[in-house]
Amino acid sequence: MLDIKLIREQPDEVKRRLARCGVDGAVVDQVLAFDEQRRRLIYEVETRKAERNTVSKQIGAMKDPAERQAKIDAMRQLGDEIAALDRQLAEVEEQQRAVMLEIRNLPHPDVPDGVDDRDNVVIYQEGEERQLPFPARPHWELGEALGIIDFERGVKLAGSRFYVMRGAGARLQRAVIQWLIDLHLEQGYQEVYTPFVVKESVLWASGQLPKFRDNLYRDEESGLWLVPTAEVPLTSLYADEILDASQLPIYHVAYTPCFRKEQLSAGRDVRGIKRGHQFDKVEMYMFVTPDQSYQALEKLRRDAEECARRLGLPFRTKLLCTGDLGFGSTKTYDIEVWAPGVGEWLEVSSCSNVEAFQARRANLRYRPEPGAKPEFLHTLNGSGLGLPRTIIAIMENYQQEDGSILIPEVLRPYMGGMERIGP
């Protein structure tokens, strides 16, 4: 959520930055109109409360019963007016908040202008689009031939966009998750194991609601929601708390399965495991002071890149343009790995600084020094990495002509020393 003070003091600047992301500035005028109503109502409530206090004092000094009763009646009338104004104020505040929750974050000045992902800028690349000395097979062919991905039984169990990992495939999935977590511990993160379901308020705090409601799974009876990413529970880990500056920065890493309805157009990524309703992801999350946040973003990016580097996968890093920037983000890097079987770069990490956007929603604050007024934290999040696209890249880059798949060296200790998944 944006800072109402910024909207009040610099409405034209807020409109200009929103326009870079294609957002109509009329929403700013709407917020300001509600804000004017709110401030007027607050003034009227306070004025009447002051009048009521004056009348109350006068009643105590009155001796004439008729005059005293008239003042009591006047005080009751003021009380009724205050109650009515309070109801109006609550309604206006709710309307203003509803509008503000729909407004995206403002892009950082470094973010390039653009319409969609075609305008994203490659800022770093390590490795080339690997060409194998034999016809590269896509992961779904490799997986079915080796018996490590079972699409038919996944559909039987849960419907389309679900699959089963079996044998060495399931073991590879578990190995990648464990290795990623261990790498991030080495990089200075603390592991957190969160619930995989959350309250609705937690989704509002992270910015998933209201925008992405139709993409989320919810249990109607309990009112709990399945997490679409570990970012959601991690955002609210310290909600409504005031941290000491000495506790910051806080770096967390968490593994969760992720659940998304993700309505896809027919024919798009229909084969394989690239897009599914359930997938695994290891998430990095940072709580930092405002002066640390852009240095923290560079660390987040480096830590995600290191995952691809140690796995021996060709990768590149893109700076997202305004047209492809996420709802809550001010600046985002995407890390993509090359997959020769499908012949495309696959996004395995998206590293974003959201500044105080989530902190305002979740009421995440810190005290800069003892006795100082609490301020909002900045938060950052990044995949480290997302599966199954990492699995796709491993399978397709490490495939052999005989259909077997070599295990990257860093993963072998996590697979009991296994070096190859063979027919």
Curated annotation (Swiss-Prot):
Domain of life: Bacteria
Binding site for L-serine: 229-231, 283, 383
PROSITE patterns recorded: AA_TRNA_LIGASE_II
Positions of ATP binding: 260-262, 347-350
Disulphide-bridged cysteine pairs: none
GO molecular function annotations of the record: ATP binding; serine-tRNA ligase activity
Keywords: Aminoacyl-tRNA synthetase, ATP-binding, Cytoplasm, Ligase, Nucleotide-binding, Protein biosynthesis
The EC number(s) this enzyme carries: 6.1.1.11
Reactions mediated catalytically: tRNA(Ser) + L-serine + ATP = L-seryl-tRNA(Ser) + AMP + diphosphate + H(+); tRNA(Sec) + L-serine + ATP = L-seryl-tRNA(Sec) + AMP + diphosphate + H(+)
GO terms classed as biological process: selenocysteine biosynthetic process; seryl-tRNA aminoacylation
UniProt keyword annotation of Ubl conjugation present: no
CDD domains attached to this UniProt entry: SerRS_core (cd00770)
Pathway(s) per entry: Aminoacyl-tRNA biosynthesis; selenocysteinyl-tRNA(Sec) biosynthesis; L-seryl-tRNA(Sec) from L-serine and tRNA(Sec): step 1/1
Family of this protein: Belongs to the class-II aminoacyl-tRNA synthetase family. Type-1 seryl-tRNA synthetase subfamily.
Domain description: Consists of two distinct domains, a catalytic core and a N-terminal extension that is involved in tRNA binding.
Function, in words: Catalyzes the attachment of serine to tRNA(Ser). Is also able to aminoacylate tRNA(Sec) with serine, to form the misacylated tRNA L-seryl-tRNA(Sec), which will be further converted into selenocysteinyl-tRNA(Sec).
Binding partners and assembly: Homodimer. The tRNA molecule binds across the dimer.
PANTHER family: SERINE--TRNA LIGASE, SERYL-TRNA SYNTHETASE
Name by which UniProt lists this protein: Serine--tRNA ligase
Natural source organism: Chloroflexus aurantiacus (strain ATCC 29366 / DSM 635 / J-10-fl)
